[in-house]
From Swiss-Prot:
The gene is ruvB. It comes from Burkholderia cepacia. The RuvA-RuvB-RuvC complex processes Holliday junction (HJ) DNA during genetic recombination and DNA repair, while the RuvA-RuvB complex plays an important role in the rescue of blocked DNA replication forks via replication fork reversal (RFR). RuvA specifically binds to HJ cruciform DNA, conferring on it an open structure. The RuvB hexamer acts as an ATP-dependent pump, pulling dsDNA into and through the RuvAB complex. RuvB forms 2 homohexamers on either side of HJ DNA bound by 1 or 2 RuvA tetramers; 4 subunits per hexamer contact DNA at a time. GO terms for biological process: DNA recombination; DNA repair. Its EC number is 3.6.4.-. One of its GO terms (molecular function) is ATP binding. It holds the Pfam family AAA_lid_4. Disruption phenotype: Slight increase in sensitivity to trichloroethylene vapor, UV light or mitomycin C. This is Holliday junction branch migration complex subunit RuvB. It is an enzyme of class 3 (hydrolase). It catalyses: ATP + H2O = ADP + phosphate + H(+). Belongs to the RuvB family.
Length: 355
């Protein structure tokens, strides 16, 4: 898993932050209020109403669970919620909270109506999660003082607060934890027009000269993810500074992204390597995950966690009971003719999941 995480971070089209330096860069571009937040109209509209209602009643906002693929703005929304409520935000992550005392220290230092943001909340340990339940429901925690026979439980009252939890894997949350969130919102991938607006906004903040077609070219290759769009913008800006007097047009963006091996649909070398292996080494599939991993020289976890999700989501790859199968889109993308529906190759190529 460590190798998988490292590999994901090294890809320019990875949706996870590549480094602490990139996280600093992201914060500089982060919108500060809902009016500036592009996309996710349904979620944004709901939050506008819930936040305004809580402010009118002088109450903390109900606990919020944000889930969806990485890089779509969950952390940004947590910061916006705190700013719109006019309160402080304390930020941590599930893996950091190793002991119950870690969480207790955070909770007891919150002021009235503050926001506590826990990223990767699905990775909370069971011990820490148990402490969280009464805190969410009754604004109280039970902590143990002392050891052995002298140990005793002490109940501490907390200030009312809002928990904002973020996760890329909502299915890994326990039911008791999930049920304690009054507001649950799924963040979806962005379309090219929305990403183009984000690119233009980020370019303005970076004092980069970009025209609408240049922004759209970057957006179309950003895999529906603002984090990737901003990362590609930085690299295209570098290219434009050296090769095009700082002007980012569609042609300049295309040349820069071609140099980075990011093709018109956002695939990089690893994506193409996987799909071409299925097409050429296994006649379009089906092929088992272990055979595919051996064929391209990657770990099974890397394929399942890093490469496949976007390819499946975009309809270029299909999982069937017999293995991975290339779809019509894959053949078209590589300029190949798909096998006839009645051929041996085409019978599984056209089989839906679960058949």
């Amino acid at each position: 898993m460590i190798e998988t995480d490292k590999l994901a971070a090294e890809r320019i089209i990875a949706a996870t932050p590549a480094s602490s330096h990139e996280e600093v860069f992201e914060r500089a571009l982060r919108p500060r209020q809902l009016d500036d937040y592009v996309g996710q109209e349904k979620v944004r509209g709901q939050l506008e109403i819930f936040i305004e209602a809580a402010k009118r009643r002088s109450e903390p906002l109900d606990h919020v669970l944000l889930f969806g693929p990485p890089g779509l703005g969950k952390t940004t929304l947590a910061h916006i919620i705190a700013r719109e409520m006019g309160v402080n935000l304390r930020q941590t992550s599930g893996p950091v909270l190793e002991r119950a005392g870690d969480l207790a220290a955070l909770l007891t230092n919150l002021e009235a109506n503050d926001v506590l943001f826990i990223d990767e909340i699905h990775r909370l340990s069971p011990v820490v999660e148990e402490i969280l339940y009464p805190a969410l429901e009754d604004y109280q925690i039970d902590i143990m003082i002392g050891e052995g026979p002298a140990a005793r439980s002490v109940k501490l009252d907390l200030q009312p607060f809002t928990l904002v939890g973020a996760t890329t894997r909502a299915g890994m949350l326990t039911n008791p934890l999930r049920d304690r969130f009054g507001i649950v919102a799924r963040l979806e991938f962005y379309d090219a027009e929305q990403l183009s607006r984000i690119v233009r906004r980020s370019a303005a903040l970076l004092n980069a000269q970009i025209d609408p077609n240049g922004a759209l070219e970057i957006a179309k290759r950003s895999r529906g993810t603002p984090r990737i769009a901003n990362r590609l913008l930085r690299r295209v800006r570098d290219y434009a500074e050296v090769k095009a007097d700082g002007q980012i047009t569609a042609a300049v963006a295309d040349a820069a992204l071609a140099m980075l091996d990011v093709d018109p649909v956002g695939f990089d070398l690893m994506d193409r390597k996987l799909l071409e292996a299925i097409l050429h080494k296994f006649d379009g599939g089906p092929v088992g995950i272990d055979n595919l991993a051996a064929a391209i020289g990657e770990e099974r976890d890397t394929i399942e966690d890093v490469l496949e999700p976007y390819l499946i989501q975009q309809g270029f790859l299909q999982r069937t009971p017999r293995g991975r199968v290339a779809t019509l889109l894959t053949y078209r993308h590589f300029g190949l003719s798909a096998p006839a529906a009645g051929s041996a190759e085409g019978s599984m190529w056209n089989t839906p999941d679960g058949a």
